[in-house]
Amino acid sequence: MRQLSALMILVVMLSLVMMPALSEAEGMKTIYFAGGCFWGVEHMMALVPGVKDAVSGYANGTVDNPDYRQVVSGSTGHRETVKVTYDPSLVTLSELTELYFSSIDPTVKNRQGNDIGSQYQTGIYYDNEAGGDVIRGLADQEKQKHSAFEVEIKPLDNFWNAEDY
């Protein structure tokens, strides 16, 4: 009986410890930014207050769980992309998207700076239609500023974490 009581106390204590972590995850949103080489985008987004995580990876390609060599070959269709998880009560999707637009050249295709190739194509990939509406509205404003606009705005098809380096 004592073992059962001790076990019950342990279960209750563990559930109380885990509850804040679970509730913190609730309300988080995710957006995916492709802005050339993912390391710079990841670093920039990770510094934003309200961003809980920025993870480099590969989005919207045709191969499951690709590695860098496959992606850089141009044969997989993936874009170097950063998955940004954020708290919308601290930073908005509009603010993140405006920061993204300020950090890229939206007028070129398959290139950012010295990085050239289809894996460096700029894009914003969303996982819910409400986010897509916000992004398309901001993209329309951005298009008015430039003679060309080459940023992909699409639903997210898939995302694979990049290898650790």
Question: PLM features: what roles do these ranges have?
Answer:
Residues 1-6:
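Positively charged n-region of N-terminal signal peptides that target proteins for export
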Residues 7-18:
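Bacterial N-terminal signal peptides
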Residues 16-165:
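Flexible coil/turn and secondary-structure edge motifs
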